[in-house]
């Protein structure tokens, strides 16, 4: 697809996408474990395959995960393999769909977008039961919600990109030709249904000629920055520079950084934000250097049921993801996995073999300057330690 420009300027080059439907309506995803060296589309036909793709990080990014789960459920309900159909009893349909969405949600509990999407289906099931709807009507209702989950994401990403770019330019654009910004992880079209969240803001700045350079962290151990964000930014021909995670402090010392822009997997009531590991350290450094720190996430990422970030469940990943690295062998031209630690690290139970590998960290609201959703921008007021994110829901 060609992304619509947020101004009257020339359209961007084609963006990558993480999910597509084939001619029969079957869901396919790019195996992101193989990026950027190999683009392989893999079919996802069943809820079990969707669960596995999410769990093994073949697809990642909270909005993209929600889209995959929803689209796979829709496709499966339309297939001959589905255990329920219009000829089933309404109770059987409600029971099976309910169990399936519980299963899909358990694949990535930190991603609130996935939970929100599944909650929409739960609410529909409850209402359908109260109205004594037929099995066929229930299935059609669920399938429509699944499609909406995917379709709504692109439109709101475009809105967030514009709002975030306008806010940061007003904050830091005075007298400057372009801004220098920094981001963590991957938040572009590969992590969403299109355009992206934090990358959407960077793209909007670029489209308005308000961007100097986008710095992006490698984001180890999974290298979402060096593998995926690098691919997206080079595809879009956006001026960018990769930095190692350990170079953040040096970057702030030696470059006039105008803003840190990140996405989120969950934003709770007081503004505390769970995002990819490494976000918290970027926020600490941003505050030390008086740099605005912006979180960009759709309303579906905001969880008002949790008062603070202390209640957010943090997923810990397998040790092998930190002790091994996948890449292209420049001699053979083939993808390979190599160990980067001594043998035994992360594999045994000795005190010297441990590996600490959380997938996310939580950035306190007091380190965040603003949260952007498709509904608006909520700024943290001077001296306060929380952000009124409910005002932009």
Swiss-Prot record:
<dbReference type="Pfam" id="PF01008">
    <property type="entry name" value="IF-2B"/>
</dbReference>
<dbReference type="InterPro" id="IPR011559">
    <property type="entry name" value="Initiation_fac_2B_a/b/d"/>
</dbReference>
<keyword id="KW-0963">Cytoplasm</keyword>
<keyword id="KW-0539">Nucleus</keyword>
<dbReference type="GO" id="GO:0019509">
    <property type="term" value="P:L-methionine salvage from methylthioadenosine"/>
</dbReference>
<dbReference type="InterPro" id="IPR037171">
    <property type="entry name" value="NagB/RpiA_transferase-like"/>
</dbReference>
<comment type="function">
    <text>Catalyzes the interconversion of methylthioribose-1-phosphate (MTR-1-P) into methylthioribulose-1-phosphate (MTRu-1-P).</text>
</comment>
<protein>
    <recommendedName>
        <fullName>Methylthioribose-1-phosphate isomerase</fullName>
        <ecNumber>5.3.1.23</ecNumber>
    </recommendedName>
</protein>
<dbReference type="GO" id="GO:0046523">
    <property type="term" value="F:S-methyl-5-thioribose-1-phosphate isomerase activity"/>
</dbReference>
<dbReference type="GO" id="GO:0005737">
    <property type="term" value="C:cytoplasm"/>
</dbReference>
<feature type="site" description="Transition state stabilizer">
    <location>
        <position position="185"/>
    </location>
</feature>
<dbReference type="GO" id="GO:0005634">
    <property type="term" value="C:nucleus"/>
</dbReference>
<keyword id="KW-0413">Isomerase</keyword>
<comment type="similarity">
    <text>Belongs to the eIF-2B alpha/beta/delta subunits family. MtnA subfamily.</text>
</comment>
<dbReference type="InterPro" id="IPR027363">
    <property type="entry name" value="M1Pi_N"/>
</dbReference>
<dbReference type="InterPro" id="IPR005251">
    <property type="entry name" value="IF-M1Pi"/>
</dbReference>
<feature type="active site" description="Proton donor">
    <location>
        <position position="265"/>
    </location>
</feature>
<keyword id="KW-0486">Methionine biosynthesis</keyword>
<dbReference type="InterPro" id="IPR000649">
    <property type="entry name" value="IF-2B-related"/>
</dbReference>
<keyword id="KW-0028">Amino-acid biosynthesis</keyword>
<dbReference type="InterPro" id="IPR042529">
    <property type="entry name" value="IF_2B-like_C"/>
</dbReference>
<comment type="pathway">
    <text>Amino-acid biosynthesis; L-methionine biosynthesis via salvage pathway; L-methionine from S-methyl-5-thio-alpha-D-ribose 1-phosphate: step 1/6.</text>
</comment>
